[in-house]
Structure formats: C-alpha cells, structure tokens
Amino acid sequence: MNNIFSKIELAFISLMHQKSRTILTVIAIAIGIASLIVIMSAGDGLKSTVLSELEAYGSDVISIETKIPGKRPVESASEMSLGVTTITTFKNSDVDAIAALPNVENYYSYIIGQEIIKYEGNAKGVMVFGYGANSVLFEKLKIKEGRFYSLEEEESIAPVIVLGGSIKEFLFGDNDAIGQKVKLRNVSFRVVGVMEKRGAISGFDMDSMVYIPTLTMQKRLLDTDYVMGASVSVKDIDKIDQTKEEIIELLRERHNIDDPDEDDFEVMTMVEVQNMVEVVFSTITLLLSIIVAVSLIVGGVGITNIMYVSVIERTFEIGLRRAIGAKRRDILWQFLLEAIILTFLGGVLGVIIGIAVSYLVYLLAISFGINWSFNVSIFSVIMALVFSVSIGIIAGVYPAKEAAKVDPIEALRKE
C-alpha cells in the first residue's frame, strides 16, 4: 500500500515540475467533462419537466391530434405560430362520436390560435387556447383568482375567458380582473378567472395565454366546426388499448381512409406519449454526449503527445532512476499514473464546473419563468469521472511503455 502511495506522490511531484503544462491539460479535460455534465443535466432536467407535465394527465388518457398524412403533429409554439399545418377534417361530430364509445368516460376538444387581446388602451398578442370545460379534469389548470368556465357556459357559447398570470398583470396590473371585459377580434369577453403562473413548457409560455371555451372560439371568433385535437379518459384502463383501436377505426371510417399511411390524425395513449418523450430526450442527450466524448478522445490524443514529449525531455531522469535500481514497471507506473492524475483532476474540476453551470442554467430558466428541473444524477457524475480516467489510462499507456523501454546507459550517455 505504501508503495502505491509513494508512486502517486512521485507522479504528483513530477507534474508539479511542469506546472503550466499540467494546468493547461487539466483545464482542457475539465472543459470537456463540464460540457458532458451540463448536457446530461439539461437533458435529464428537460425530460423530467416534460414528463411531470404529462403525468398530470394520468395513464387512463388517450390523446387524438390532427396531422398532415405521413407527417407528425405540430409540437411547438413556433410551429403553431408559423401555421405549419391546418387540418380541418377533425370535426365536432367526430369528437361526439368518440365520446359515445362505451369505454369513454370524460373528454374535451381543443383548438389553438393567435389573437390580439385588448383592454382599454392596452393590447398584446396572445396564444388563445380554445379548451373544453372538461380540460380541468385532465390538466394542471390551477386557478389563482375566480374560476374556470363551466360546461354550461361552453354549451351556450358564452363569451367568457380565463387569463394567464402574465396577461392579467399586463392588462390590469394589481387591479381585480374578475368581471372585467376584454376584447378578442372586437368580441367582448367577460373575465371569469386568472391562472396560477406555470412558466414555459415545450416552447409555450403558459402565463401569456388565455383560455376560452372550444365552441365559443369556433363560433364567435373563427366560424369553424373543426378542432385540432381531443383528449379522452377511459372507464376501464385495462381496455385502453382496445379503446384506442376503436377510435382509430372510427376516425378512418368517418374520414374515408383505407390506407393507414393516409391517416390525418394520430392516436396515442398517455403511456405511449411518455415513452416516446423518454426515447426522444434520451436519444438527443446520447448524441450530444457522443459528440462531447469524441472531443474528449481527441483531447486524449493530445495527452498522449504531451506525455510522449515528456518522456523525451526526461530521458536522463529515467536513465538515472533505472541506474539506481528502479525497474521497468516502476517507470511505466510513474508515467501512467501521471496521465491518470491529469485526467482525474480534470474530471473532478469538470464535474464541479458542470454542476455549477447546470445550476446557473436552472436559475436562469426559473428567472425567465421556464419550468425547469435541476437534475445532476450520481450516475452522470460517476460516468464522467470513469470516462475521464479511462482516457488517462488509454492516453498514458503508449508513452509509459516507451518510458519503460529507455535503456539507462544510453539515456545517461546522451545527457
């Protein structure tokens, strides 16, 4: 044991004699490891945030979304605002037919658009969520002031509106908004509620949105009878897959679709959505981590070159140590330990920097109202350190072997 510690001490002393080279190498490794930690933390944090939102729906929910045949549904606020797709085939009558299926318990449909909201002299562009009144049974729609609109108000096409927290502050400041009238497309809406602040989710600023009944949006603003999607909950969760297939068959029949590739809708259970999100985020995190890992491997080649130059520069030292009794394996271990110590120190420093940067990203996201999770797992820290030390071992083997091969007589003669 003492022999091992003496070898480590000797390796440290040798590295301290080359402070500039040691510091630069440690910093280079630290930057790579820090990048790896930040990427893994950001990926895990974002995945946790999205999954926590999806879990609010429960495992008994089926989602139906419109899409262009052969393509995926719209997934972000930027796509929505650019009008990437407008499918008009999913009608109110389709939703009613789905609701009539024997295993469907509750449901709501939705349509989303952009409008200018006005109150006295204030005006602002907002995302308008035409949501069914039953949406409160599915989503985390928490009311801070007032209430959410009722099913009766939706059925009567009542001009009622629920404001996001930021919109309420913009239009009314500290004044009470409940009962006040705001305008969308010159149609007056009575404010019945104000949402609690939720931050941003998947590109949507949830606090800069307003909610009105689906039918109200269709009839009073858009003059349409189609929706963008719907969610249904089932009575018997054991039959959820069967109900999903019934919905698919029903919509294909109503839309006259024979080829599944021509589906203008997508039906997924919430469990499938959660699994898909996990796969997508895990894949993105893995790909980015591989890119960083490649850069670290390139850094390992640099360490090999540095250590090889060090062997050449320290030929006399190696020869002298061999002459006074050091064995080949002693020389090999010294140079190998130097490479391992370099990468281990770089790994530890990188982990510390990575955790600090990840926490700063978390604080920055929170300050901008983005719903974000700070998540640095023990697994990612251990993996980063193991990868860092592995690079040191691999990078140090060749120069260490070359150092062990040095002939002591030739080394002393050259000096």
List each model region and its residues.
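Glycine-centered tight turns that cap/initiate beta-strands
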Residues: A100-N106, D176, Y226, P408
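Mid-to-C-terminal secondary-structure elements
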Residues: N134-F148, A158-D258
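Short cytosolic juxtamembrane segments of multi-pass membrane proteins
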Residues: N2-I4, A400-E415
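Hydrophobic, regular-secondary-structure patches
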Residues: D44-M127, F170, Q218-K219, Q242
